[in-house]
Swiss-Prot record:
UniProt keywords, alphabetically: Membrane, Transmembrane, Transmembrane helix
Segments passing through the bilayer: 159-179, 203-223, 234-254, 267-287, 296-316
Name this polypeptide is given: Uncharacterized transmembrane protein DDB_G0287441
Localization per Swiss-Prot or TrEMBL: Membrane
Amino acid sequence: MMDPYATTHRRLKQIQGHFMTPQSLRVLPQFTLNSLNNKSNISSMWRKLTTSSRIGAVSIPPLTAYYIFKLFKGKHRKFINDKDIEIIIKEISGNDIFDQVVKLASKVIGFLGVIQISNRMETHLGVKLTFSKSYQLLVTLSSILDTILSFTKLTQKWGIIFCIVSILYCIINIRMLYLTLAHNKTVERLLSVTRTKCQGFKMNIPALGAWGSVVAITFYIWLKEAKKLAQSTGGILTMTAFLLSAIAAIRVGLRAAMTSFPGLTPFEGSSAVVIAIILGALPLIPYYTTSEWSRTLLSGYLSIVISMIINSFFAWKTPSML
């Protein structure tokens, strides 16, 4: 018969090994929570960001101001009446060189973050429930669809570059899905008896309230625009890929708020994904008033960003023994 204490102890070591450096495993100190003041917390988070994430984070405020300025400057821009989703998405995504650079930067930052997540996953394969299987499955499917779409855009400006990045994303996501499904299956079954002792189960009311408010706003906008959106044609792969990634992120945010435990870690990787999503969504802002699709996508990105911020917050906090 398995010793419950030994199993729980091993589980705690696995969790701590995932969140800490390999060197800390030799000492195995007691779990503590990051409970400093707000200024110290922000400073601690900033130090844990990768260099690319810091550059992206610093760029967000001026870029947001720039795109909001473009929104007001072009408020009399003609409304987009085209019914083809692919044409609409191309029109509202920003087509000048600066927009392309911003989108490419978001892809690169996100990719570097995903590599962080993948490397940590491979190092600590036995960390049960640290990575959400449903999230990884949905994101992988979305990545595959994005890659297929990128091949249809090779003739466009920057098409080859974005295609290469999409392929790299797809490969790393498939690898992570394999690690999540194949390697963790046996360990999950072995350690299932310790789930309530080692996984967070305390609901975080502020996080849940923020998540619920933003998701409610998103669904309100989607329902409000549903009639116009239904008149659009084509773009099935594009919207399916977006919805899969949105559902994955929103679910991770809900799970983190309900359990006070992240569904996507480490913080360095999760925060990079948040920054990448924000940067990628910014070029849509100037077209908020000219297309229902811009409003739909931006509201969706809002829910994704808030959900991932909630997840990243709990990924930053050191897990505690419950």
